[in-house]
Design a protein with these regions (language model features):
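Central antiparallel beta-sheet cores of small beta-barrel/beta-sandwich binding domains
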Residues: 21-99, 106-108, 112, 142-145, ...
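Accessory cap/linker subdomain of secreted extracellular hydrolases
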Residues: 257-364, 397
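Alpha/beta-hydrolase active-site loop
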Residues: 204-224
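Short beta-strand/loop motif that positions the catalytic acidic residue
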Residues: 365, 371-373, 377
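Conserved alpha/beta-hydrolase
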Residues: 179-196
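The serine-hydrolase catalytic nucleophile loop
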Residues: 165-177, 191
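N-terminal cap/lid segment of alpha/beta-hydrolase-fold proteins
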Residues: 119-152
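Short beta-strand element of the alpha/beta-hydrolase
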Residues: 154-163
Length: 448
């Protein structure tokens, strides 16, 4: 009888603990399972907290390498609707009614419908710590998060830079977590002009953005948990220009990771990318050439503006007149050309960024560098860019260069299917494993 009473007491305490953790709501807690469509599984973890009458829902999608994605929560009767907006305008939605330890229902996203089935589970053991930080580059204040392994002392570290457009730190959180799992700290921050960072994105030159990354390195050098001589800079896409430029600017950068980097200038890369988007939309090569030529002429006026060439205004008016002729053309929106250029001169920093030539920078690099691409990248010209970068590194006699190209991987590190059947977005996690393992090997080298 005594044993029975003790067993009952332990069970009651466990039930009370679960009741407390779930905030007296059938939805709150940690849920683990998957979305399923036509036999294809897409793993999902949900962490849902209730405070008062409101919920906070965070979703992890391990197959897409997406972590901590915030969802809004609505309730109608016993049915809950979790929703997250998407750039396409069509949100990702979970809708269902939890029953005890099971939460299942309908799912929609990416233009598809499916079902989801989740079970209540114990939350995974946390392997990292994080804290909000801020650092300065001149008049610009950059807000970020320092993510470090939960256990241990001095860590090597990586400053993670951004792609194009005003990016916030959340988009790089999963990359930071990959590093933390292997004992490396990472600083992610809101790009200038985004999130809680001050400054203006559009007015920034490539040098401005690289100096922001260097400021992050200098900040990390002062942190007690960071080994000051073992700090590198990593970047994806536009970050593949920023990271190596930061290493040329500062001897404090111990190594560089350039993912999906373009070996050609941003203006040429933009023309290449837009042409590929138009091909995907089914436009003819003749139409694509017309749009590409217009874009090249538009960029040429930008160079004129940068050089204070008085012919710039006249040429921009001429291009505006041509664009007016095509205002009803079905390809104009796909070409992403402005309908009118009057009074729309870009700031000088944006023009300097547009015509940034990367080869001289690579020639000056002296630190270990990892170059990683996916061979199905349609945003940057991989083979052309790889040739340019490696030639420049050879000219500069950089002794420590590693190159990896992953098959069937696109610019977003998403696996490109070899057949035509639909699948959930899946990231090639081997891509990130290669990056982290290379970093671990370099940090073991006493010379950096």
């Amino acid at each position: 009888m005594k044993i029975l009473f003790v067993t009952f007491s332990i069970a009651l305490l466990g039930a009370l603990a679960v009741f407390s953790q779930t905030g007296n709501s059938p939805l709150a807690g940690f849920w683990q399972g998957a979305v399923e469509k036509d036999g294809r599984i897409w793993r999902v973890n949900l962490t849902i907290e209730k405070t008062g009458a409101s919920f906070k829902a965070l979703a992890d999608f391990p197959d897409a390498d997406g972590y901590g994605r915030e969802f809004s929560v609505g309730q109608t009767g016993e049915t809950f609707r979790l929703e997250r907006p998407q750039p396409s305008g069509v949100p990702i939605v979970f809708e269902g009614a939890p029953r005890g330890d099971v939460f299942k229902g309908s799912w929609s996203g990416f233009g598809q419908t499916a079902t989801f089935n989740l079970k209540r589970a114990a939350p995974p053991e946390k392997f990292y710590r994080e804290r909000e930080v801020a650092f300065k580059n001149g008049d610009v204040t950059l807000a970020g998060t320092l993510i470090a392994p939960l256990k241990g002392g001095k860590f090597g570290a990586v400053v993670i830079t951004h792609g194009a457009t005003p990016n916030e730190r959340a988009g790089y959180r999963s990359w930071a977590l990959h590093f933390a799992r292997k004992g490396i700290a990472a600083l992610v921050y809101d790009k200038r002009g985004a999130g809680r960072s001050t400054g203006e994105t559009r007015a920034a030159s490539m040098e401005d953005l690289a100096r922001d990354a260097v400021a992050g390195v200098e900040f990390l050098k002062l942190q007690p948990e960071i080994e000051s001589r073992r700090i590198g800079v990593a970047g994806h896409s536009q970050g593949g220009w920023i990271a190596p430029l930061a290493s040329v600017m500062s001897k404090s950068v111990a190594f560089v990771i350039a993912s999906a980097a373009s070996g050609v200038s941003p203006d040429r890369q933009s023309i290449y990318h837009r042409a590929n988007l138009m091909r995907e939309d089914g436009f003819s090569e003749e139409t694509i050439k017309l749009a590409s030529d217009l874009r090249a002429r538009l960029y040429a006026t930008g160079r004129m503006l940068l050089e204070n060439d008085p012919r710039a205004a006249r040429e921009r008016r001429r291009i505006s007149a041509e664009l007016e002729k095509y205002k009803d053309a079905p390809w104009l929106d796909a070409a992403a050309l402005p309908p009118n250029l009057d009074n729309d001169n870009p700031p000088r920093g944006a023009l300097e960024l547009l015509f940034f030539e990367p080869a001289p920078m690579w020639e000056k690099m002296r630190v270990p560098v990892l170059l990683v691409w996916g061979d199905k990248d349609k945003v940057v010209p991989v083979e052309e860019g790889k040739t340019i970068i490696l030639k420049a590194l050879k000219k500069g006699a950089n002794p420590d260069v590693t190159v990896k190209v992953f098959p069937n991987v696109d610019h977003g590190v998403t696996i490109v299917g070899t057949d035509k059947t639909w699948d959930f977005p899946r990231v090639d996690l081997n891509y990130y494993d290669a990056i982290v393992n290379w970093t671990v090997s370099k940090l073991k080298n006493q010379k950096i």
